[in-house]
Amino acid sequence: INGFALGGGLELAMSCHIRVASLNAKMGLPEVSLGVIPGYGGTQRLSNLVGKGKAMEMVFTAGMITAEEAFQCGLVNSICEQEDLILTCEKIASKICRNSKTSISSAIKAINAGFIDGVDGFEVEKKEFGKCFGTEDFIEGTTAFLEKRKANFN
């Protein structure tokens, strides 16, 4: 997130798994000042990320918060200088890419399940955990661990 992420821009950012903001970023959901409410999951994602009280404050005041405030309340995962934004994102992506794509996919399903009404996140986790066994990634990961080397997931 670089610069302003207001309304739909913040709603789009909140739909991402991980958010990184430059220190010049300003974020907010000003829709109530226009006579509507945040849409596209904005109210739901915001409250899941920052908690009910902070979400209500942000929506009701239609104000903006700084990158530092967004980091403190959990709206963004990390902050950095504007000139370091791309490099910071690339470093995070590189760390993710070193891991098992199959396991990451299963982890996303399990984590997201905990936020869906009527879905038992623990059951989804148990199912996804079980699916990981016997995969090529599991074999590579455990073999690499036993051989004291880094796994090579391709």
Regions found by a protein language model. Give the residues of each.
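CoA-thioester-processing core
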Residues: L6-V59, C73, T88-I92
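Acidic, divalent-metal-coordinating active-site segment for phosphoryl/phosphodiester hydrolysis
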Residues: A62-E69
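Terminal low-complexity tails and localization/encapsulation signals of metabolic enzymes
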Residues: T143-N154
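C-terminal long alpha-helix characteristic of the crotonase
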Residues: V20-A25, A67, V76-V124, G130, ...
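A short, small-residue-rich loop immediately preceding and capping a beta-strand
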Residues: I1-F4
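Hydrophobic alpha-helical segments typical of transmembrane helices
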Residues: G42-R45, K54, T66, S103-S106, ...
